[in-house]
């Protein structure tokens, strides 16, 4: 008999809602545990099956920690500003707020249908003025500390866009044209707000060491910050009093510099270009205007450039170096100028070959006529550096440069300041007023939040000036000071990153109108103990959140230096064909259908049993139905055809389940603690198999089993808990314990093979049967790597010896 998932799940979701079962008190003698997901952008498509994977993982940890005696904070909110809502509003004439709120409701209903133990009293939405009031407050504090400033920044400008020119994001530019409509895009300087994240570069780098994060994520952050120690070198321009400053990590290769390259936007280009080269330079600059930074720095693209006609002098040997411009050098990195050493840099070598420029080896090894030699070696053709190794030569070159006032040691960062302006309507207004007398002021703190004005469909269209549509809201835009001076509000809005850079703090005190959050509550809850989300946010979101958190720590607003102590990235759920799910491929699975047909608990069990949380794995409809069959089997173990507790659940304990029960409590506890959900479920399956062989099921063991099931399949567990005669719900019942003395027994090591090759092993009870051995084998992480997505053709199991899984 199958259990009725629809009525059971509706019943317990209603119960949890009415009793506010998961509301977390801010004052408790219990130790706190703060667990959260990266909050979703509520798109019009709703949830896909990838979302519940991470959400189920955090929910299991929340439920487990509650049972272990922790005061658990498990909140949810909405990262709800974003371009799609604005595009929808322009197209339909509907307000983006209405579109967004409708999407939020769809997401919320879907999330609630999965039975997550969320404290909904703390729900936040980044588009709520009472929320973005504090985003604006943080901006004002950054401004007051000199960490928010205006600068001329190159943007992607589409002047021919219908309704007037528009600025588009890098990701909206494809081959020099807008993604929507295919209108030409040009690079154009425009005033933008910028946040000085570089002031925190060293701390952002150093404090990574204290975090329990995947090493790969830490490495990506280190790479993005890109700290390097090198030298600034000054090259005098021939027949000019100007100098070009170059930053290089390899001053030891100065003797190999053969030409110089400036970015086409470099301030000296027009000044130093000779009359003969002016037309070529102007044409090249126009050609580059339509290329994004991503296109320009693509390593595989053909090298292009133009000669300025000017020369610079190499300070170390006096050689004249031709000065070129090329798009592979960006004005935003370093000084926007490089010394080219084609013998030992791939891009410089390709450029030199393309334009027939000389190549001179200064490090021994390789054939530089065939390819750049980028390994280490002894210095040659380098005067006083000859015979030295890399580090010795770098140190000596820097000393020489400093002695001759031709350069100095320099620490550089790849990290650039954060461009904080967006030419959009649907974002947080930046609380600045520009006055006609040339001054600017912040909107007074007492007047925050500065709310977005209601706008018509016509007003939401591009302003035509490059400003956001807010420039069309004249009543909102124009202000007059008490002394009669007129002013205009800032028309740029904040990027979507703003709301997600501090939301974890607002969950702590979401309804506070006087402060971002109460200091005592922050002291109790921070920092976040477990943060789960996709690896695609490994760099920017986490870096920006860490930056704002450190700034707020310096202000004394938050009590910790870092926001997230432990970070886990869930793996991607792929389509059945191992491809990424996408609408265009037609392989997207809607979780609503799974919940409707199989139940939320089935989806939860299946997604956690698919494999290790952090690995990508393919979706399988057969796997879903298999998970449902197991839950039906659990139900039948305890409940009869009359919907009553079976007679063989008894207070009598014959002892035949003692060992497997205590083994299961130990294994499941350890696995949940370490987020090994697939092997925890596997152990529960082993226990169920053994329980079916027993004539009497001790009620104490059945209680414990249902408690262990509860974090993973909470609706079914609650129903079984009530069938077992308990009045209270299961959420706060103390986690079962095991007796170490019951674990002492004869054990044996068994081998797991795939196609005859050893892929794993485990220590198990000597009397284990074939089915249980197979369950252990399938749960082994390494075995899963070799059988995932393959057809199992045969299984050979010798009890106490080995399991061999034959796949095709």
Swiss-Prot record:
Residue ranges of the motif 'HIGH' region: 40-51
Top-level taxon of the source organism: Bacteria
Known EC number: 6.1.1.4
Entry's localization field: Cytoplasm
Pfam families: Anticodon_1, tRNA-synt_1, tRNA-synt_1_2, tRNA-synt_1g
GO MF: aminoacyl-tRNA deacylase activity; ATP binding; leucine-tRNA ligase activity
The entry's keywords: Aminoacyl-tRNA synthetase, ATP-binding, Cytoplasm, Ligase, Nucleotide-binding, Protein biosynthesis
GO CC annotations on file: cytosol
Residues annotated as binding ATP: 583
CDD domains attached to this UniProt entry: Anticodon_Ia_Leu_BEm, LeuRS_core
Major location category of this protein: cytoplasm
Reactions catalysed: tRNA(Leu) + L-leucine + ATP = L-leucyl-tRNA(Leu) + AMP + diphosphate
Motif ('KMSKS' region): 580-584
Single GO biological process annotation from the record: leucyl-tRNA aminoacylation
Similarity field: Belongs to the class-I aminoacyl-tRNA synthetase family.
Protein name: Leucine--tRNA ligase
Organism per entry: Leuconostoc mesenteroides subsp. mesenteroides (strain ATCC 8293 / DSM 20343 / BCRC 11652 / CCM 1803 / JCM 6124 / NCDO 523 / NBRC 100496 / NCIMB 8023 / NCTC 12954 / NRRL B-1118 / 37Y)
Chain's gene name: leuS
């Amino acid at each position: 008999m199958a259990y009725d998932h629809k009525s059971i799940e509706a019943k317990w979701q209603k119960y949890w809602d009415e009793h506010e079962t998961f509301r977390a008190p801010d004052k408790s003698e219990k130790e706190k545990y703060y667990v959260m997901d990266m909050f979703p952008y509520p798109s019009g498509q709703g949830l896909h099956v990838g979302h519940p994977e991470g959400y189920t993982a955090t929910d299991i940890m929340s439920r487990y920690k509650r049972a272990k005696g922790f005061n658990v904070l498990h909140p949810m909110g909405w990262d709800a500003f974003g371009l799609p809502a604005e595009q929808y509003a322009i197209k339909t004439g509907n307000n983006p707020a209405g579109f967004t709120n409708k999407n939020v409701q769809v997401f919320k209903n879907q999330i609630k249908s999965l039975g997550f133990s969320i404290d909904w009293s703390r729900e936040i939405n980044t588009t709520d003025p009472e929320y973005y009031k504090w985003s604006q407050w943080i901006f004002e504090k950054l401004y007051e500390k000199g960490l928010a400033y205006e600068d001329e920044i190159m943007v992607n400008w589409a002047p021919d866009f219908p309704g007037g020119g528009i600025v588009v994001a890098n990701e909206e530019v494809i081959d020099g044209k807008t993604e929507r409509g295919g209108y030409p895009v040009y690079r154009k300087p425009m005033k933008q707000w910028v946040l000085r994240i570089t002031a925190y570069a060293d701390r952002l780098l150093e404090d990574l060491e204290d975090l329990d994060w995947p090493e790969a994520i830490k490495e990506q952050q280190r790479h993005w910050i890109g700290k390097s120690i090198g030298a600034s070198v000054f090259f005098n321009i021939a027949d000019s009093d100007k100098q070009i400053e170059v930053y290089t990590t390899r001053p030891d290769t100065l003797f190999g510099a053969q030409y110089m390259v400036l970015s086409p936007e470099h301030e000296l280009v027009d000044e130093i270009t000779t009359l003969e080269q002016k037309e070529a330079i102007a044409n090249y600059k126009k050609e580059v205007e339509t290329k994004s930074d991503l296109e320009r720095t693509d390593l595989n693209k053909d090298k292009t450039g133009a000669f300025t006609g000017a020369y610079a002098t190499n300070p170390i040997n006096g050689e004249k170096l031709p000065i070129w411009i090329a798009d592979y050098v960006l004005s935003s990195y370093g000084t926007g100028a490089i010394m080219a050493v084609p013998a030992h840099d791939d891009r410089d070598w390709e450029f030199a070959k393309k334009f027939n420029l000389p190549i001179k080896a200064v490090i021994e090894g390789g054939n530089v006529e065939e390819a750049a030699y980028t390994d280490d070696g002894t210095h040659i053709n380098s005067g006083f550096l000859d015979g030295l190794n890399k580090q010795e030569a770098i140190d000596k070159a820097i000393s020489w440069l400093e002695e001759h006032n031709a350069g100095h040691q320099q620490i550089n960062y790849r990290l650039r300041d954060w461009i904080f302006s967006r030419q959009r309507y649907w974002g947080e207004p930046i609380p600045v007023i520009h006055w006609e007398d040339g001054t600017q002021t912040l909107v007074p703190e007492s007047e925050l939040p500065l709310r977005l004005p209601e706008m018509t469909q016509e007003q939401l269209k591009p302003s035509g000036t490059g400003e956001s549509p807010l420039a069309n809201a004249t009543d909102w835009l124009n202000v007059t000071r008490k002394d009669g001076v007129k002013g205009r509000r800032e028309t740029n809005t904040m990027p979507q990153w703003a709301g997600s850079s501090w939301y974890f703090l607002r969950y702590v005190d979401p309804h506070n109108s006087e402060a971002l959050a109460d200091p005592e509550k922050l002291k109790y809850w921070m920092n976040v103990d477990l943060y789960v989300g996709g690896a695609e946010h490994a760099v920017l979101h986490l870096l920006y959140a860490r930056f704002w958190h450190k700034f707020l720590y310096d202000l004394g607003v938050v009590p910790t230096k870092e926001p997230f102590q432990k970070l886990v990235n869930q793996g991607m759920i792929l389509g059945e064909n191992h491809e990424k799910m996408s609408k265009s491929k037609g392989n997207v699975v809607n979780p609503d259908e799974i919940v409707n047909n199989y139940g939320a608990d089935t989806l939860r069990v299946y997604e956690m049993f698919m494999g290790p949380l952090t690995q990508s794995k393919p979706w399988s409809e057969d796997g879903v139905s298999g998970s449902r069959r197991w839950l039906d089997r659990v139900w039948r173990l305890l409940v009869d055809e009359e919907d009553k507790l079976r007679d063989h659940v008894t207070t009598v304990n014959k002892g035949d389940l003692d060992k497997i029960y205590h083994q299961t409590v130990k294994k499941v506890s350890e696995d949940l603690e370490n987020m090994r959900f697939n092997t925890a479920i596997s152990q529960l399956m082993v226990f169920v198999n053994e329980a079916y062989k027993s004539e009497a099921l001790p009620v104490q063991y059945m209680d414990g089993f249902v408690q262990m099931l509860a974090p993973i399949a909470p609706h079914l567990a609650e129903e079984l808990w009530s069938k077992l005669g308990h009045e209270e719900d299961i959420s706060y019942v103390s986690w079962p314990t095991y007796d170490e003395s019951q674990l002492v027994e004869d054990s044996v090591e068994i081998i797991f093979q795939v196609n005859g090759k050893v892929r794993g092993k485990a220590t198990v009870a000597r009397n284990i049967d074939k089915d249980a051995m197979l369950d252990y084998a399938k749960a082994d992480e390494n075995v899963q790597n070799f059988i995932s997505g393959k057809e199992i053709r045969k299984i050979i199991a010798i009890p106490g010896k080995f399991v061999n899984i034959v796949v095709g």
